[in-house]
From Swiss-Prot, chains A, B:
Active-site residues annotated for this sequence: 67 (proton acceptor)
Lineage of the species this protein comes from: Bacteria, Bacillati, Bacillota, Bacilli, Lactobacillales
Gene name linked to the record: rnz
Quaternary context: Homodimer.
Cofactors required: Zn(2+)
Reaction equations catalysed: Endonucleolytic cleavage of RNA, removing extra 3' nucleotides from tRNA precursor, generating 3' termini of tRNAs. A 3'-hydroxy group is left at the tRNA terminus and a 5'-phosphoryl group is left at the trailer molecule
Role this protein plays: Zinc phosphodiesterase, which displays some tRNA 3'-processing endonuclease activity. Probably involved in tRNA maturation, by removing a 3'-trailer from precursor tRNA.
Enzyme class at the top of the EC tree: hydrolase
Protein name: Ribonuclease Z
Binding site for Zn(2+) 2: 67-68, 214, 272
Annotated EC: 3.1.26.11
PANTHER family: ZINC PHOSPHODIESTERASE ELAC PROTEIN 1
CDD domains on file: RNaseZ_ZiPD-like_MBL-fold
GO molecular function, one term: 3'-tRNA processing endoribonuclease activity
SUPFAM superfamilies associated with the record: Metallo-hydrolase/oxidoreductase (SSF56281)
């Protein structure tokens, strides 16, 4: 998995930072891409990446502020104009009202999409979706308007079948390998029984990525961020601006770092950077956060991060 | 007056052309700026110009296709965020539905503007607005959906008072200059009467700028473009693609040039260039049009054109 930031600014675009959007690339066998927020100009940013809009099959919206949603109608329309193979469906997850906004925008512009568009408007906190490879959880944050954070849990990869060890045990190769890999107990032709579980290597833990919308500090953040391999957290304000952050329903870099430290996050990526922070001041934001949580980075537009598999203690595997 | 193109592409943004927007800068004493269409990313383009959003007090929308309106909510919101002196009101002229689109976008995003926003939805063709300096006319074009073209007529500048000639006539300077300039007949202290009209130089003709939305060729184009000093015309297709242009409710470069020639246009600016036209092919578009109407240019994003005063025959002045 890889994260690519398409917009890392707050409120309005600036010359150096577009408004919010981040792509989560599910590499490996799935090759789909999920977008989190679609500020105005996200489709323009995508033109400068290797992301192909047809690969984006899910969009998660944190909240309805313009700098997080105004790029949605244009992105959806342009995705429709792309030729070639049949365009797959796309599902948008977001707060109540997101389907109205998109549908009205498409209707007034008389845009007929070439693909199926589905909406899931969030109501209850907890497990939002589950498929073969992922579970996605959504919990409410504390912002000026309804706002959600997302926790993407990759499922564990099952261990590999240890073929060499099976050969040593003189188990015949063939269809029984599939049953052994599934963990079954198999009776061989010579009467011996062997247990698949004894021939499967260690499972590889899946990764956890937490992507938050704009928020004050609130207990749900701990639920969302616990043990995350990567936490994407807003940092609209700097150290010493806690009061401002609270008044404007945002967070400081130090609050984000404190959360990361408290709940065992591996890497903290700070985004939603105010236009007031430029040049050296961005380094100061990062430095202040690093004092609390060393593995912190203030991201820029187009920054890309590979998400490594977590190292776990043996007894957990 | 000056035209600055902020987006010159068709349908979707490309790396080299953004979707539609053009700014008409009313220099001289007014110093206001009028925008024609606001495709997604127009506010981003403005960041790379000297245009200050607060100076934009009128927006004219040609039609409701997404590549002409999806930048409107973001532009309006960001204009609101700008600090400093009190922000003046802004009026949007456009087809029926434009106020719904904007109001719903602002409502769902809970955006409260810091300035007064007014709408004028077009119904009848003809004179749309008149002030001290300008008349703006709107006529319907022939596109897939309701679409309008705008003709901006600058009023003539009255001639200057010929102070030297007054001195020669030994007319005393002072408050009577104002009355003479207004064309009054004034009785001097020495009993002579002098006619202001004899001491006013030639009037300067105002300029005519015609900015069209997407369109097939249709008789209203002639009404809109007659004697225009500058005609901004779409050129989605090239020579020999007349049938395609007709089917998709667009024009070819040669159709635009033919119109310009027929109705006495001074300069033709071709925009709304398809992403199919890049590099040398753009030059070909321009060359084909120039064969019919030599003073033609295919515009690029950020191209800026000063609009010169027309030279008129003496008897017209």
């Amino acid at each position: 998995m890889e994260l690519e930031f398409l917009g890392t600014g707050a409120g309005s675009p600036s010359k150096s930072r577009n408004v919010s959007a981040v792509a989560l690339k599910l590499l490996d066998e799935i090759k789909k891409i999920w977008l989190f927020d679609v500020g105005e100009g996200t489709q323009h940013q995508i033109l400068n990446t290797t992301i192909r809009p047809r690969k984006i099959d899910k969009i998660f919206i944190t909240h309805m502020h313009g700098d997080h949603i105004f790029g949605l109608p244009g992105f959806l329309s342009s995705r429709s104009f792309q030729g070639g193979e049949k365009m797959g469906p796309l599902t948008i997850y977001g707060p109540k009202g997101i389907s109205d906004f998109v549908n009205i925008s498409l209707k007034v512009s008389q845009t007929k999409l070439s693909y199926e568009l589905n909406f899931v408007e969030l109501e209850e906190e907890g497990l939002l979706l589950e498929n073969d490879r992922f579970k996605v959880y959504a919990y409410k944050l504390d912002h000026r308007i309804e706002c959600w954070g997302y926790r993407i849990e990759e499922k564990d990869y099952p261990g590999e079948l240890q073929v060499e060890k099976l050969r040593e045990a003189k188990a015949p190769s063939g269809p029984i390998y599939g049953r052994l890999k599934a963990g079954e107990v198999v009776t061989l032709e010579d009467g011996r029984t062997i247990d698949g579980k004894d021939f499967i290597g260690k499972a590889k833990k899946g990764r956890i990525v937490t992507i938050l919308g704009d928020t004050r500090q609130t207990p749900n953040l701990k639920l969302l961020a616990k043990d995350a391999d990567v936490l994407v957290h807003e940092s609209t304000f700097g150290k010493g601006e806690g009061k401002l952050a609270r008044n404007y329903h945002h967070s400081t870099c130090v609050q984000a770092a404190t959360l990361a430290k408290e709940v065992g996050v591996k890497q903290l990526l700070l985004t939603h950077i105010s236009a007031r922070y430029v040049g050296k001041m961005v380094k100061v934001l990062e430095k202040e956060a690093k004092k609390v949580f060393p593995n912190t980075k203030v991201v820029k537009d187009f920054d890309t991060f590979n998400i490594p598999f977590p190292e776990r203690k043996d007894d957990e595997q």
